[in-house]
Curated annotation (Swiss-Prot):
InterPro entries: ACT-like_dom_sf (IPR045865), ACT_dom (IPR002912), AHAS_small-like_ACT (IPR054480), D-iso_2-hydroxyacid_DH_PdxB (IPR050418), D-isomer_2_OHA_DH_cat_dom (IPR006139), D-isomer_DH_CS (IPR029753), D-isomer_DH_CS1 (IPR029752), D-isomer_DH_NAD-bd (IPR006140)
Gene name for this UniProt entry: serA
Protein name: D-3-phosphoglycerate dehydrogenase
Annotated GO MF terms: NAD binding; phosphoglycerate dehydrogenase activity
Function per UniProt: Catalyzes the reversible oxidation of 3-phospho-D-glycerate to 3-phosphonooxypyruvate, the first step of the phosphorylated L-serine biosynthesis pathway. Also catalyzes the reversible oxidation of 2-hydroxyglutarate to 2-oxoglutarate.
NCBIfam families: PRK11790.1
Keyword Oxidoreductase: yes
Coiled coil: none
Active site per UniProt: 241, 270, 293
Superkingdom of origin: Bacteria
Activity regulation field: In bacteria displays feedback inhibition by L-serine.
Length: 410
């Protein structure tokens, strides 16, 4: 089915920051979107405002920050895509208040992060980071002391989501006994076992790997008290969010010999560029693997992320689908022949849907299909109407008190 969109695709403007993968450009081009500005780096301040002032879609990774002020500087903005898992670089509430859905890629780098963590487990269990550092310094310290196979060791996973469960599968294939803690009851994969308390997991596992989102409840999840609950000689890995581990508490535990080692890929404060020095008390420890937030930085993951997020842009632009948006009611309505599609985003208050439908009743028009979803703050309705001219309808929809945004899609 082919429909004439309300705005020619050549006039719909995209801007992509931070060198997102070519697959994103390919996906947009294949769908007919060619008006794309592309930046290999993050922008901020007035430079960012200038770059986004006339755009409809913004694509970014983790270093471009869309604050409420920046969102206001983009009056034509329709949607935002985070070409990564995290969305804390975007003011989600400010975007919602403007009727702007935000999309991300919660699945595409799952395998890459899980593989990095597994590799770190193998290296730390064999004391490879220390051995590597010593040999670089000319020290030939051939020893089996403290070096272990992973087979039969207990892996504790905190957060059994996409990455945590993927790690569970591949770790078990190497013979590890997998335990996990999650605030929700989850179906264990393979022979993994869910424990009922965080304390039980921390005190019993040889390796603990963190896979939780950045929330107020997870800030400094691994603090002095929790680190003290770890087994003597345990290994701690964080490839989740930088605020989850109290870095000073971890450094002290390493100084005290509490842990065999650690691997940290994310930090509370990270350099903005390669020209800025990375500062951390963890730099002094040979038994700590430090990586610059590269958990999802593989060619395969970045390619998949490009396809996934750009694909969500296309669906929202073409048919209004908001499936998997992180800040918006999820709506997807199949297309219907011989109709015009209108989108209406409004404050979630009583009577708005009734007023909306009354407009079609007064125009003596049949609604071929309608889909409404709400969250506590906003409602989003997609309407397919049997008419040849939707312009008068759009004018009336915009006049409804409580309307945030309304437009004719096609």
């Amino acid at each position: 089915m082919t429909n004439k969109v309300s705005l020619d695709k050549s006039k719909i403007k995209f801007v992509l920051f931070e060198g997102v993968h070519q697959s994103a450009l390919d996906t947009l081009h294949a769908a007919g979107y060619t008006n794309i500005d592309y930046y290999k780096k993050a922008l901020d301040g007035d430079e960012l405002k200038e770059a986004i002032k006339d755009v409809h879609f913004i694509g970014l990774r983790s270093r471009t920050h869309l604050t409420a002020e920046m969102i206001e500087a983009a009056p034509k903005l329709i949607a935002v895509g985070c070409f990564c898992i995290g969305t804390n670089q975007v003011d989600l509430n400010a975007a919602k208040a403007r009727g702007i859905p935000v999309f991300n890629a919660p699945f595409s780098n799952t395998r890459s992060v899980a593989e990095l963590v597994l590799g770190e487990i193998l290296l730390l269990m064999r004391n490879v980071p220390q051995a590597n550092a010593e040999v670089h310094r000319g020290v030939w310290n051939k020893s089996a002391t403290g070096s272990h196979e992973v087979r039969g060791k207990k892996l504790g996973i905190i957060g059994y989501g996409h990455i945590g469960s993927q790690l569970s599968i591949i770790a078990e294939s190497l013979g590890m006994d997998v335990y996990f803690y999650d605030i929700e009851n989850k179906l264990p994969l393979g022979n993994a076992k869910q424990v009922r308390s965080l304390e039980e997991l921390l005190s019993s596992c040889d390796v603990v790997s963190l896979h939780v989102p950045e929330l107020p409840s997870t800030k400094n999840l691994m603090n002095v008290a929790r680190i003290a609950q770890l087994k003597q000689g345990a290994i701690l890995i964080n490839a989740a969010r930088g605020t989850v581990v109290d870095i000073d508490a971890l450094a002290q535990a390493l100084k005290d010999g509490k842990l065999q080692g650690a691997a940290i890929d994310v930090f509370p404060v990270e350099p903005a560029s390669i020209n800025e020095e990375f500062i951390s008390p963890l730099r002094e420890f040979d038994n700590v693997i430090l990586t610059p937030h590269i958990g999802g930085s593989t060619a395969e993951a970045q390619e998949n992320i490009g396809f996934e997020v750009a694909g969500k842009f296309v669906k929202y632009s073409d048919n209004g689908s908001t499936l998997s948006s992180v800040n918006f009611p999820e709506v997807s309505l199949p297309e219907h022949e011989g109709t015009k599609r209108l989108l209406h985003i409004h404050e979630n208050r009583p009577g708005i849907l009734n007023k909306l439908n009354q407009i079609f009743v007064e125009a003596n028009l049949n609604i071929a299909a309608q889909y409404l979803q709400t969250d506590p703050k906003i409602g989003y309705v997609v309407v397919d109407v049997e008419t040849n001219d939707a312009s008068p309808l759009l004018t009336k929809l915009k006049e409804i008190d409580g309307t945030i945004r309304a437009r004719v899609l096609y």
